[in-house]
Amino acid sequence: MDARADQIYNPYRVFTRAQWAKLRDDTPMTLNATEIAALRSMYDRLDLKEVEEIYLPLSRLLSIYVAATQQLYFAQRRFLGIVDRKMPYIIGVAGSVAVGKSTTARVLQALLARWSPRPKVDLITTDGFLYSNAMLERQGMMQKKGFPESYDLPRLLAFLSDIKAGRRRVRAPIYSHLTYDIVPNEYVTVDRPDILIVEGVNVLQTGRLPRDGKAVPVVSDFFDFSVYIDADEPVLREWYVQRFLALRDTAFHDPRSYFHRYAPLSDEEATATALAIWERTNLANLEDNILPTRPRATLIMKKGTDHVVETVALRRL
């Protein structure tokens, strides 16, 4: 297929970093360097330039999408002749382990919350909907933690359904990255936000089509917009190893850490351990479950080796 044909049939418009940065237009910078540093994960890179050139154009785009969705909502309400609660706008953020999803989600939350008028913007991660370690151990699934089958999908779908229905004080379980497990009897409460950001590796996952033709909901059915954070596999592998080494020198030293046993490892031993975990679990999950969902995203941000976004692909309407 020649370049022109590929452009015609490509469902995305692809922008270079420079092209995308120009779409910021006059969107104001509402974060300072200190606030940006606080949003950044310890093993990620984010600076004022990245926010200006990548996230401010995305914030502007999202403001357009949210406004259009609100107009459509009110038009539908007039058509149906009903008075209904305003439904929150839900944004999904997907991508591999170590790609920087959490940083992206936090930056979006901070920027969107400073729109005028100030909307209520909440953020949850799907980690809280993982089955407990005890359950995964009983099912022999600890090696597949993070795979689609390791999540309590009915509970996650019920949560999103309640949010979309406008219910008050909907609770989501809390996950501890220190203990690598669900925190018993602790929850975060989501109370009718204007915008909800849902971050997780498999949020764009689809299920198998039922043979009986019955509708089977998936998480992304509840999304109004979705972002996939992308990077080449060798780059992701290197970032995962770097993160593992950084955690070995910090969080792993806490006796409560699930990975405390790795704290004494040498650089060589820690690197070998991280690579083994990547190959056994994260790479398999990426290739089998995460990467195949990339074409379902509304927008794809592709990162280079230095953690900065190099290209942005926006799905055509």
UniProtKB/Swiss-Prot annotation:
CDD domains: PanK (cd02025). GO terms for cellular component: cytoplasm. Its EC number is 2.7.1.33. Pathway: Cofactor biosynthesis; coenzyme A biosynthesis; CoA from (R)-pantothenate: step 1/5. GO terms for molecular function: ATP binding; pantothenate kinase activity. It is found in: Cytoplasm. The keyword Disulfide bond does not apply. InterPro entries: P-loop_NTPase, PanK, PRK/URK. One of its GO terms (biological process) is coenzyme A biosynthetic process. It catalyses: (R)-pantothenate + ATP = (R)-4'-phosphopantothenate + ADP + H(+). Pfam families: PRK. Keywords: ATP-binding, Coenzyme A biosynthesis, Cytoplasm, Kinase, Nucleotide-binding, Transferase. HAMAP family: Pantothen_kinase_1. Belongs to the prokaryotic pantothenate kinase family. PANTHER family: URIDINE KINASE (PTHR10285). This is Pantothenate kinase. The gene is coaA.
